[in-house]
Amino acid sequence: RDNALAIAGLLNRDIGGPSAKPYQPSGYYEAIQFPDRNYVADTDDRQYRRGLYMHWQRTFLHPMLANFDAPSREDALCTRTSANTPQQALTLLNDPQFVEAARVFAGSLLLSRRPKMDDAALLN
């Protein structure tokens, strides 16, 4: 996630402060057996903070973190498990933060190239 945001130029590199709340699927916390939780995703540049600052619910990892084998927070680990699963590819293709990073990166590529005469013909 941090790499995708950095490549797109979206990564917020601020140090310290409260945790960031990126997009979560609606109703994701409904299964938690605690009092009602109202998760409100950040809509400003805080949603692009480094993964280190992402809000973690101890028993319910953010779906993107779970899909990419994030370790549990109960134990200290020297190495992480590594797996390649179809869910990871689907996350990269469909998670709103990855889609937004790809859109912004593609836009910056299009704006950075010099237009050619053939471009007008391609559009028609």
Give residue spans per PLM region:
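An acidic, gly/pro-interrupted, aromatic-rich
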Residues: R1-L122
